[in-house]
Amino acid sequence: MALKVERVDTWAATIKDQPGGLSAKLETLAAAKVNLEFIIARRSPDKPGTGVVFVTPISGAAGLAAAKKAGFKKTPSLHSLRVEGPDKPGQGARITAALAEAGINLRGFSAAAIGKKFVGNLAVDTTAAAAKAMKIIAKL
């Protein structure tokens, strides 16, 4: 089975670094029936007391309104791809090595496996790099 790769918009919001800081943002999206496929959150070491959460996807009028209400913004500097395929040893290494060989620098890469499938989200610096990465990954 070939890898499936697609462009995705990543949304980000600042969160309070305290109990409930993340859940407040996610509850706003959940109330609008936004079905998130990817969530990653972390502290902001350069801004004590805050963190950042990245999510995808957000769509539809209700989802977009909820995102705005919760302080989420589409990240114009993150050119993100969603990769899905069979889980097998070395899958992440194959993807990252192919991108490195093509001179594509990754801003970030997160992946997980469930059962016999894996899904990963990666970000690159430019639209051109994302288009190039899509072609490379689709051939793996």
Describe the residue ranges of each PLM region:
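A conserved regulatory-domain signal marking ACT and ACT-like small-molecule sensing domains
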Residues: M1-L140
